[in-house]
Every structure is written in structure tokens, then in C-alpha cells.
Amino acid sequence: MNQIEQKWQYIWQEEKAFEVSNASSKPKYYVLEMLPYPSGKIHVGHVRNYSIGDVIARFMTMQGFNVLHPMGWDAFGLPAENAAIKNNSHPKKWTYSNIKNMKKQLKSMGFSYDWSREINSCDPEYYKHEQKFFLELYERNLAYQKASFVNWDPVDNTVLANEQVVDGRGWRSGAIVAKRYLKQWFLKITDYAEELLNEIQNLKEWPEAVRSMQEKWIGKSIGANFHFKIKDNEETTIEVFSTKPETIFGASFIGIAFNHPIIERLVSKTPEILAFITQCSHITRSSELEKAEKEGVFTGLFVTHPFDSNIVLPVIITNFVLMDYGTGAIFGCPAHDECDHELAVKMNLSIKQVIKADMDVQKTAYTEDGILINSDVLNGLTSNEAKQEVIGEFEKLGIGKRSVNYRLKDWGISRQRFWGCPIPMIHCEICGIVPVPYKDLPVTLPDDVNFDGHGNPLDHHPSWKHVNCPKCDKPAVRETDTFDTFFESSWYFTRYCNSNATEMTDKKACDYWLPVDKYIGGIEHAVMHLLYARFFTKVMNEQNYVSVREPFKGLFTQGMVLHATYKDEHNNWLYPEEVVKKGNEFFHKESNNRVVQGRIEKMSKSKKNLIDLETMQEQYGADAIRLFVLSDSPPEKDLEWSASGIEGCSRFINKLEYMFKAIDSLKDDVNSEVNKELNRLVHFTIKHVAEDIKHFALNRAIARMRELSNAISAEISKDKIDVKIVRHGFNVLVQLLNPFIPHITEEIWQKLGNKERLYNLSFPAFDESMLELDTYIMAVQVNGKLRDTYEFKTSVSEDEIKQVTVSLPKVQKCLEGKEPKKIILVPRKIVNILV
């Protein structure tokens, strides 16, 4: 099998089978899988992702489209730097070696990529364009530097964006993330929050789950900003944001973030307060607040109520208010907010009901809208009426105004790492921040770097960062932070349109290919890569690089590949190939000691539940692997890897070769019986496989092709064979299977005597009239109860149906000699005889 696969891979390469032109009279179709990080090896999860994309690309080519199906490398990132530290070598060497190996693996799987458009994000010829783009953003005030609290990963020694912190830990290292106050570069994604939110409704070919995740991440809140005066210091105020300002008369405390500026200015930092601030610094995302037990510590400060100066409220540092949401301060209304209620119970704060409810708010918060009570002039108003009234009063008093808030924050793009795209800025003591002139781009990374595992090597390099200021020509220093690697992947899909363009994009080529018609990747990128790419596309549109404002018309999120985990008697993880099954138990191959099978989980290096792709290819071939990852589960669901599953796929491919030999030896027989049912199944399969592929029901398409294969096999085994339909059916089967298992189908197609390559052929056509059955079965009911069934010819009349069904013995028994009162027909389905 490997020889056949290598043969066809060589032919495709020599014939430039999958290279496409930007100038074609055909309609375009752009299918793209998320580009991989060159970690060293392609894993089975990659193969599933890329196999899905390859089926779609090959199918759309067969449908007459000019299909762009490119591949490249998201090549900057921490693993390369960690490998450099470990091996004392440059990350570039490690990265390029991995790319070479992974490209070879991808080609060995037979994916139909246009390799002439390959991109590599760590190539200066690629990243020089994003450096220029960053400078353009800076000129438009869409890029800026400021000091802020950031998420610090103590293991990777770098800053993480909010989206890269999962359950309080770094998304890559797993380390507990802390807060640090550092100067960082940001992009003003918040300027586009409203458009990013509004356009979600137009992404009709995206999964609802992803659209919902983006909506929640952007998190639009409509309410009011207003001020509370600090008691005994009325010139100082605390500004709060609230989505329910109408509950102001139920306020019992002011909650502030642990890093609110007022703490530094006015709060005496007792050991209790300092300990609490340290504890809070580990909470980095609002999603974590929902899980955390609500806690607080009193600051010693009080504020006065804006509508009644006799009411004073304590100011409390809480662990559920974040500085980067709203103003970093809220007023707590325990009767009508669950977080506030939990804290009030814990700290013995008052719980005052201000919305009418048929429940005890001392026990549980009532969070719905309703009629206002205990609220002075707001009594009797609905929640919405009271909201408008109270905001109007804030505006009259000059203490507040209506406001819209977003959970989305500006994107922090600074990373304190070496292996990333250098940020093209210079710091001058005289001129301040100075952009690198366009003519001096790209700013490249030095080759002579010392990796000792401590901080950013660019900071310690003896010469790289020392330059003269472009403005005053005095000594200055380069910015040593590099871009977040999501910067590169936020625009790469535009580069494929013409990877040799002298500018960031070839606009004419982008106008032809964009938007991407189908983008395929994991749902874990819903609020990072996918949101950033949407943001970049909007800005690139404004910079005249592209004409579209949304990058991806359709999105498909595939499931993960899972495998059982195994541990030995010492609790050490084992690779699957180290384990053998005997009966219902598992044993270590070498020691024969009993092995414990654990949960079926996502494949990971740490738990060793990995499958070595090269070993699988040697044993079964690329086609069998492709078929298995597509056939055993719907593509959007998780797939459990199983040895029996891939063995079954290998047997199916071998069966195709046996079928070819059997059919090739058949002689035309004028006495053979015409098999109308097989002919109908051929046309039925063509129609429904096409529909299944269009709807990404690839496992169902494979099941239909297996059914056709079985029907053809059954016909071959008969004494009198319909040779004509068997040959036609097998030809069709080979064509239908080609997008899934391209190597063996091209081989069989050639052996069948065909000169044209399968990759150049159109998808088989079906005849609608051939789908009609000669007969159909109807359910026969008496007074709505099923009594019998009967098979009718398609030519039968309604009167004949009535006569036949009434005369059926089971019906006659129910009639007991009576005449039917009425007979109701549901065409080709039901006859209901009423007595």
C-alpha cells in the first residue's frame, strides 16, 4: 500500500495537481484548516482536521470550483524557545527542522495542498509586513503602550492575554497566573467591540456555540456610571458602573477590585488587607469569579448614598470585582444580586429588598425585574421605568450618566520572549517612543543569542537592542518585547491569496479569494484566534489591504481524537503500544504485569495516550488512517481511536482491490438479469453522498458508500450477474471514495483502463428518475389502528388501493360485515378505513 501511495504522491507533485490560479472562469472556493505549530510531528488530531478539509477541497473541485487549499506554519512560540534552552541551540534551527519533517508527513498523507503558496510566520519576509501593519495601527492610535496589571506566567516568564488564562492557569504551561504591573503594548480591539458583536448575527454558517461564546466574551452591558462621595473626604469619589442602577436604594456596600487606585491613596494596608490582595491577584478572569467563593475585607472607608447623605455604605475590597471591567467598583445590592447576597451573608451586611417578589430575599437573591418598593420616588415603577428615572436624576445632579460597558478588553500583545516577531519600536530618552522607519523593516532577531532560561534573551544581548534614535540620532534602545503569536495567525489567511505579494496582501487576489468559504479548526480558538482574526480583517479593510470585513464565511469545529490511558503498578503512564489486552484485562508487554486502563481522554504527551502516525502509516497506509478518522464518528464529535476501527478500514480498502479483480475478470453475459434495485442504489448513493459531504456528515457518506460496496459484492456472487450495472456501480463507487481515500482509488481507476485522473474528473451525476421505486408499502389502519401493510405498484390508482385494502382478511375481520364509513388516503404512506 505504501508503494501505491508514494507513486501517486509523486504523480500529483510532478503534475502540480493541486496548484490553482488566481485567474479562472470557474467560481472560487477557499477551504482552509487552521495552520499548525511546527512541534515536530503531525499527530492524529491534525490528521482528522486536515482529512475533513481535504474531503471538502477535493469534493468542491469535483463540483467545478476553482479551489484554494493552502498550508503553512504558525512558527513562532514558546516550545521552540524551551527546546533552545534544553538543547543550547537557536530556536530557528529547531523550528525549520520540524517544518521539514512535518511537511514530509503531510505530503505522505496525500492532502491536496497547494504547496506553492506555503507560508512560514517566522520568516522575515512574512513578518516584515505585520511590523509595518503595526506601525500603521500606531499611527492611527490603534496601538499604544501603557503600564497595567497583566497576567504573569511564572513558568514561561511572560505576559498572557486574558483569553490565554484558563481556570487561573497559563494555557500552555499550566502554572498559576499572578498579576504584575508592567508596561505593555495593546491593540484597541475595544474600538471595534460593537461591530464585532453586531456582525455575529450575520455569521450564519458558524456553529451557534462559537457565536454564543464570542457574544459572551465581548459582553455588552448597558447601565450607568455614577459617583459616591467618600465620607469625611467629599472631594474624593468612587465611580461605579451598574447595569441595575434602579436598585440604588437597596445598596448596602461598595465593592472594589483589589487593585483599585483608591486603595493606594486612602487605605491603610493591614496584614489582613495585604493577604487578601495577594489572594485576589491570582484571579485573572471573570469566568473564575463565578466559581470562587465570594469574599471581602473592609477598607475602613465609607461613602455616602447619592440620594440620602444620612446613609453611609462601607467600602469593601472583594474578590469578585475586576479592575478591567467597568470602573473596578460596584455598589452591592444583596437582595437582588447573587454575588452581593453571598458576601452580605458572610460579612453580616444588610439585605434590603427594593423589587417586589414572592420570596424571602434574606435567604436568596431575587434577580428578576419587577415593581420597585422601598425606593422613595421610584416606588411603583417598573424596573425599566425606574432605571430611566434614576439615570436622569444622576445626570441632573452631575454625578453620573448612561454608559455601555464591554467585557472585552484591549488586546495585550507584548510578550517577554525571544522567539517572536520583534515589536518595531525604539525608546529614546530625548524623543520618547519612536517607530522604526518603514525603510528599516524588517527588524529581525539576532542569531547569536544565549539561552539560559532566565527572562528574555533580547534584554541581555550585548548589541542588538542598542541603536541610534531615528529622530535625533542619539543612543537609544529597541523594544525587546515580541508580538503575541496570535498576531501572526490573525492575518495569515490573506497571505495565501498571493504568498509572494510585495505588500502585506495582493488586494486583487484577496478580492477574488476572500472570504474563506470554509474554515476548519478547534472550538478552543473561539475567543482568541477567531476574534482576533475578525478584528484584524476590519482594520485591514480600512487600510485597503482587503475588501471584506469578515474573514470566514463558514466555520466548522471538529471534535478531538481520544484514546484510553494506561498506568502500571507504580502509577506511571504507559504508551498504548506498551500494553496488550488478554481477555478483558490489560498487561505490560515486557513485564507481563497487570496494567490499569484509565479514562478515555484527549491525546497528550504527558499521559502518553498517543498514536505514532508513522507507525500507523507503515502498518495500514495513509488511506486507511484517513478513512478511519472520518468514518467512526460525526466530524463535529469526539472520536475514540481504536485498533479494531483502523483494521476494519484497512480491510475495506483491501476489499476494493479484490472487487476490482473480480469485476475485471467478468465477461458480458447477454442472459444476465437486470438489477434495477442496484441501479437505483447507485443513483441514490451519488445523490446522498454529495448532500452528506455538503453538510459535513462525512461518516454518513462513508456508511452509504460501504452499503453500495456490499450491494455490488452481493451481485458479483450471484450466478447471473448484471455485469453492466456492476461495472458502472464500481466505477461510481471509486469516484465517490476518491476525496476520502485518494491513493487507492486513483490506482484502481487507472487499472480500470481510464486515462483521465480522478482529481480532474467531475463528481458523478445521478438521474432523478432512477431514484423512483417500482413499488411502495402502505400502512393499513382501521379507525386509526394499524392492522396490516401492503405493497403497491407505483402505477396503482386510488380506487384500486381502496378496493385492495378493504378486501384484506385482517381488515375484513375488523369490519365484521359492515361497509366502511370513509377511507382516508395519505399518498404512499397510510390508508385509514373508518367504520
Curated annotation (Swiss-Prot):
It comes from the Bacteria. A motif ('KMSKS' region) lies at residues 602-606. A motif ('HIGH' region) lies at residues 36-46. One of its GO terms (molecular function) is ATP binding. GO terms for cellular component: cytoplasm. Its EC number is 6.1.1.4. This is Leucine--tRNA ligase. The gene is leuS.
